[in-house]
UniProtKB/Swiss-Prot annotation:
NCBIfam families: 3_prime_RNase, PRK05054.1, RNase_B. GO terms for cellular component: cytosol. InterPro entries: CSD, NA-bd_OB-fold, RNase_B_OB_dom, RNase_II, RNase_II/R, RNase_II/R_CS, RNase_II/RNase_R, RNR_Ribonuclease. The lineage of its organism: Bacteria, Pseudomonadati, Pseudomonadota, Gammaproteobacteria, Enterobacterales. This is Exoribonuclease 2. GO terms for molecular function: exoribonuclease II activity; RNA binding. GO terms for biological process: mRNA catabolic process.
Amino acid sequence: MFQDNPLLAQLKQQLHSQTPRAEGVVKGTEKGFGFLEVDAQKSYFIPPPQMKKVMHGDRIVAVIHSEKDRESAEPETLVEPFLTRFVGKVQKKDDRLAIVPDHPLLKDAIPCRAARGVEHDFKQGDWAVAEMRRHPLKGDRGFYAELTQFITFSDDHFVPWWVTLARHNLEKEAPDGVATEMLDEGLTRRDLTALDFVTIDSASTEDMDDALYVESTADGKLLLTVAIADPTAWIAEGSKLDKAAKVRAFTNYLPGFNIPMLPRELSDDLCSLRANEVRPVLACQMTLAADGTIEDNIEFFAATIESKAKLAYDDVSDWLEGRGSWQPGSDAIAQQITLLKDVCQRRSEWRQTHALVFKDRPDYRFVLGEKGEVLDIVAEPRRIANRIVEESMIAANICAARVLRDKLGFGVYNVHTGFDPANTEQLAALLKTHDVHVDPTEVLTLEGFCKLRRELDAQPTGFLDSRIRRFQSFAEISTEPGPHFGLGLEAYATWTSPIRKYGDMINHRLLKAIIKGETIARPQDDATVQMAERRRLNRMAERDVADWLYARFLNDKAGTDTRFAAEILDISRGGMRVRLVDNGAVAFIPAPFLHAVRDELVCSQENGTVQIKGEVVYKVTDVIDVTIAEVRMETRSIIARPAV
C-alpha cells in the first residue's frame, strides 16, 4: 500500500537531504575505533563496528549522528579507496588465503585468492602483490583481494629490495637488449686520445660517464674540457632500447645495488669511460678566468678520448691533503690533479660570490654482507675530490643551459623558482620575528633569493633555515629555460650523466643537432612528466629500502644504553623526528618520552620548538643524545628517547 506512495518517497528524500553528511579521510588507530578527518580542524569519531566497513586512508562520505553532545560518523559511500594495488604478506589457514597489507596502520588480513594466470602455490609468509576487488561500501559483503604477483618467500634475505621494487612497480633488473654497432650520426669526431683525460669516481664505480682534462694558458686562464660518455652514439631515438630508457628515466640507485637505465653492456662497458680504452664522447671546452668566470667562447663538439687513469675520490683527496701512501701513476696525472684542484677553487669561489653553494652533507653508505645483512653504515664526507667533480659538472651544465637557450630556445632544464608567491608575506613576517628583514616581492627574484640565502647561511645555526623550508617550491623538470634559485643560477640543464638519466640523453641529441647545424623538435612534455614521476618513485624506493636496513642494523641496540648523537629534523604534536648523525637513520621520539606531564608540554610544529613548563627545551636542528627504545621490524620504525 505504501510502496508507490509519492508522499513517502518525498519524505524519504527530505530526510536524506536533511541528514548532515561530511566527506573526509578515514584515520585508523591501533585500538579499533577511528576518525573521519574532514580538514585540519574538524574530525568525527568512527565507532569500532562502523570501522569494519572502511579502511584507514579511504576517502568517504559519512552520515553524522549526534547523541548527547557527541558526534559520530557512519560511513555511507566510498569516494576513493586507500588500497587499490598493494603489497603484503600471505596467510594460509585450511587452504584459505588472506593477505595483510604492508602498512603500519593496516593490521587486518583481507581474504583473497590467486588471480587467473598466477601459477605460484602461495604459502604462509609469502610476499605478494594484490589488487582490491571488493569493498563493503560498494555493496559487497566484505573486503576481498586478488593476488596478482608472487614477490618472494618470507625467508629471502633480499625481501627489502624485492618488496620495495614491487610496491612502487619498478623494474628489478637491467633492461634487455644489445647495441651491436655505433650509429652513423654524420658527426666529425676530434681525436683527443693523446690527451691526459682522467675519471674520478668511487672505487667501485663501473659506469664512468665523465672524464676531465685541463690546460693552463700563458695569461693565467684555465681551459677545461669535460668529456661525457656518448650512449646516443649507440642508441637511436625511438629504438627499443631508447623506449626502455625513456620509461625508466633514471638508473635506480638502491643501497647495495643499482638497476641501470641502459643494458649493463652499455652502461658498464661500451659507454663507460674506462682507463686505456678508446671511447666516443660528447665534449665541452670552456675557458675559466682567474676569478672563475666561464667566458663566452664555450664550445661543444664530438670526440674520441682514451682515459689515462681511473682515479678514486679518497685517493685523490688523500694525495691533495698530503695523507696516505697513494701516488698518481705519472707526473702528467699528478699535474692534471693539481690543475683540477685549481679549477675547483676558482669555480667554488665564483659560486660563493655570484650563485649559491649547498652546505656539505655526508653520504651514508651501507656495507652489506652476502645475504643482505648490514655489516656497517659509513658516513662519507664530501671531500676535495668530490668537489672537483661537482664543480666541473656544474660548470659543464651551466654551459649546456646557455648554449641550448641561445641556439634552440629549449632543452631539458632543471628549474626551481624559490618561494611560492602565495607564501612570501608569511615568510617575511616569520623572518621579521627573528630580525631578518626581506621584501616579499624582492625575494621572488633570483637576486633577492640569493641575498636571503647568504644571510641565512651566515646564521650561527640552521634553525631559521629549517623554519622557512616549508615556504619553498619544488624543483621541476621543464623544456623551457628558467632559473634555478636553489643553485642561484639563471639556467641549469644537465647532460653529464647520460648513462643514468634519460633527460641527459635528450640534451645530448639536442647538442648534437646544434653541432651539426640541424633543426630539431622541442622535446615532448610526456618525457619530462615521466622523469618527474620516476624521480619521485626512485626516491621513495631508496628511502623504503634504507628504512628496512636501518631497522635491521639498529635492532640489537633497542633497549640498550648505547648513545647516538641525533639532529632534530622536525617537531609535531606527537613528538619529534630525529636523524642519527653517525649513520643517517631517522627515528621518532614520542612526546611522553620528552616529559611525563602532558599539560606541561607544548610541541609546536609552527615554531619548531618543544616547551616544558613554558621554557624552550628542544628546537629543530639541535643535536641531542638519544638511546634506541624500540625497533618495530614489521613497520620498520625506530623509536628513540632522549639519553639521560
